Amino acid sequence: MISLLVFTGAASYIASAGWHTNVFTLILVSGSIWLGSAAANTIGSYFDRDIDVIMDRTRGRPIPTGRISPANARAYGLVLLALSLAISYYLSPLSSLAMLVGFLDYTVVYSYLLKRKSWSNIILGGFSGVMPVLVGYFATTDPVLPLATALFLGFLVFFWIPEHIWSLAIRFRQQYEDAKIPMLPVIMSESRSVQVIAVTTIIMVAYSFIPLFDSGFNLHFVYDGTVVVLGGIMLAINAWLLHQPSAERAWTVFKISSPYLFFVFIGVVADVLLHLH
């Protein structure tokens, strides 16, 4: 997940800078997002240390296995955060602000406040996924894309998160239930959860089509073709899951949906560079 967040931020910077992309700035954008995401992951693991030991998929993490103490993990996470904020502030104060908002949303809103209390944890915690796109955008001194496009792309990440995480949660439903984490598939039946996932996918695909009908986003035929093809694939695999809900099919949907954002952002970068050429 960290790699994907770094990629969306880097792609956002390239798309915003166009042919004036600075390699050094691109490295700083990528590094600051990696450090910030790693910081959020580390502090999140610190908060989750008592439940990570319960779940098979998380008990191999450094804190549950004793490779690092909780106190040292917390200190390490804060050092990573400080480095991330320093680098992103060098890029732009707004980049640093976006980084801080993303960190706080993931660690405080998602991990600390909501993860153990509400199925909406990944929705309200999903705003953290928006921020790397803004970090990359605000690092551009003279963006060729409007801010509305950066916000649009950031919220495409937001709308992608429910299908991605809830498909995973169906596969590991029993582990979440054992850890008393109220993920959607824990509090709803498998078939009902699949229906909700399908609805969120339809919303995401419909949202991705908005620039097809609004030239103000400054995205053109490469983006249009990319989201139409990928949207069709996403709808098809969700229809397949709806036809026969199962943990195995949900796991397949999770794996197929994972590269969706990668290809969308590749399409965005290609679209912008070709249009400016």
Predicted regions located by residue number:
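Transmembrane alpha-helical segments that form the membrane-embedded catalytic/substrate-channel core
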Residues: 34-43, 104-111, 154-173, 205, ...
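Small-residue-rich segments of transmembrane alpha-helices in multi-pass membrane proteins
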Residues: 4-10, 61-62, 124-140, 254-267
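Intramembrane alpha-helical segments
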Residues: 70-142
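Membrane-embedded alpha-helical segments that form the functional core of polytopic membrane enzymes
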Residues: 7-47, 57, 81, 97-108, ...
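Hydrophobic alpha-helical transmembrane segments in multi-pass integral membrane proteins
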Residues: 134-145, 204-211, 260-277
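Multi-pass membrane catalytic core of lipid/isoprenoid biosynthesis enzymes
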Residues: 56-97, 189-214
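Cytosolic, membrane-interface loops and tails of multi-pass inner-membrane proteins
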Residues: 47-68, 166-194
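Interfacial loop-to-transmembrane junctions
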Residues: 235-263
